[in-house]
Each structure stands twice: as structure tokens, then as C-alpha cells.
Amino acid sequence: CRGAHEEVIALSEKLNAPVVYTFKGKMEVQYENPYEVGMTGLLGMPSGYYSMHEAEVLLMLGTDFPYSAFLPDDIKIAQIDIKPERLGRRAKVDIGLCGDVRMTIQALLRMLDPKTDDTFLLKQLKRYEGVKKDLAAYTENKGDINKIHPEYVMSEIDKLASDDAIFTVDTGMTCVWGARYLQATGKRHMLGSFNHGSMANALPQAIGAALAYPDRQVVALCGDGGLSMTLGDLETVVQYKLPIKIIVFNNRSLGMVKLEMEVDGLPDWQTNMLNPDFAQVAEAMGMTGFNVSNPEEVLTTLLNAFELDGPVLVNIMTDPNALAMPPKIELGQMVGFAQSMYKLLIN
């Protein structure tokens, strides 16, 4: 939906329809949108999930969202995409239109009659307000020593970053916090390994973004697992004098891998990490490095990092037990988690 923000709003207004977006489309759709009800997918929100599943018709705009389990299979689906091979690839489509999203919506707006009943829209907006309150509650508790709440950290980054910042997010738990707590402004951009889900993407993408857009703030949001795979890139950042702000969400584990294993009923195996002092590594490479283990020092350290010229790495000791709940919990997920805990106890 890039470049079609106004058209999406106009279509939603005419149909009194809620708008749901994917993680990849968040920065293009969320901002200044009175009809948005949150994100869908594993990192998404109940309001986004249920809006799609309680609707009678779903219109998919320029999306190749790969997680079919989150798409409804018992309602009518229409899809617009400029690439014909994407039509019907992820879900059974009743109507498929091949074309530019912006131009196609413009044509449709002239043919559609306004829908005056806003009952469904208001129901979903009310649910979304509750979801937002729940998400905000996680940021009110900063956490404890060496167990800083990542939700709080990401919410502070959102407040401090510039309106046109470029964020890069590592695959894993960092993606969850970025998806839920970084807000779109219409000028911000977010990069990640959204199609492939490969690890260790944040720092290389940040290097590319900083070289391509030297006048914009670039923030690399790294997991400790991802950063461990790309430590050599810190030298590249210094060599090219790139003023990237590198924030490490250091939960001393491969958090998302661990969670996926538990959901599948597997005992935790080789997901805990023995990390180096990332701040000292950064200093050895020639950039400024900070360690943060006290939640009361998060805000002042982030402020210092954003105000300093040149590259900075902030290594924040986050809570390894912070959970990312999916928008809808299935029975199989609960059974798998219980099996995982049982196997761990036996062993």
C-alpha cells in the first residue's frame, strides 16, 4: 500500500470498514488512520485478528502475507495486487484484480455506494482501544535489575527517535517489541527480514540505510543472538563513520527459537547464550558503548546515545522471561507448552 495511504483511508471511510495491516505494511498504513485496528499475524493483536475473522468480506491490498493460518477461510475474499502470481497464493480468493493498488482503489471509489452502518467498525475500534490499553500497561513497569522489560525500552525508543527515523529490526523477539511499540508517522521506515525470517539482519540493513540516507537517523534494534552473528560489522560502522544507534535487547537467549520449541512441545535445548560484554566490544572497535542493567538508567542512557555524534551501542539487559503472546492462542499451543515444561521437569 505504499503511496496509497489517502486512497485506503477514503475506501475505509466510504465502507465504514476497519483497516488491518501486516508488520511489513505498518509504517505505510497506521499513521493518521482513524480506521486502523492493529496488526495481524503472529506478532499482531487480537483486534486485527478478529476484525478479519468476524467480517463478511476481506479485501487484501498489495499483500503477500505468508501466514495463512491467520487468514479466514470461511468468508469472501477479494485481492488487489500488481503481481498476478500473488492473487490467491495465500488464501482462496473470490475476486482477484491485477493492478496498482492506488489506481485500482481510485477506480473502485467511483463505483462503490457508501455504507452507512458503522456497527461493525465501532465494535472493532472499541476492541482495539482495549488492546492498546493492555499494551500500554506493559510499559508502565520498567522491570528489575538485569530484567528490564523490553516493552518499556521500545516505547522509550519510539518517543526519542526522530519522526523520519529508519529502524532496522532483527528477526526474533526484537521484532515483536518493534511491531507493537514503534509508531508510524508517515515519514518513518522499518526494515527487517520480513519475507525470509533470517537472523542477524538489523546491523547490515542499518549500514545500508545509513549509506543511502546519510541525513536521516538510523536505529538498529538488535537481539543478542543476531548481533553475535554480525560483530564484525561494528568495525565497518566505525570505518565508514556511520552515526548508527545500535540498541541491543540482550535477553541472553535465542528467545523466539525457545518460544517456538516450547509451543511445539520440545524441551529447551541450546537456546541460552553466554554473551561477551557487547559495550566493551563496541569500545574496542572504536565506538561509544554503554551497558544498562538498571531500568532506572534506560531513559538517560538512551538520551545520551541519541544526542552523541557518531555510532553508539547500548547493551540493555532485558527480561529473558518476557513473553510475546500471539493474537489468538490455540489449544495445540497450550498443549505443546505444557508438554515442553513436563519434559524439562523430567530431565
Which residue stretches match the model-derived regions?
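Glycine-rich, acidic loop regions that bind phosphate or pyrophosphate groups
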Residues: G25-K126
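Short internal beta-strands
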Residues: A17-F23, A78-D81, I246-F249
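A short acidic, amphipathic alpha-helical/loop segment
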Residues: A4-L11, Y67, D73, E156, ...
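A short, gly/pro- and small-residue-rich
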Residues: A10-N16, S68-R86, K187, P326-M341
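Redox- and metal-dependent alpha/beta enzyme cores, enriched for Fe-S-associated oxidoreductases
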Residues: G3-K24, A165
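Thiamine diphosphate
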Residues: H5, L42, Y49, G88-C98, ...
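Active-site glycine- and acidic-residue-rich loops that bind
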Residues: C1-A4, N146-P150, G226-M229
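Active-site diphosphate/adenylate-binding microenvironment
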Residues: V8-S12, E129-P204, A209
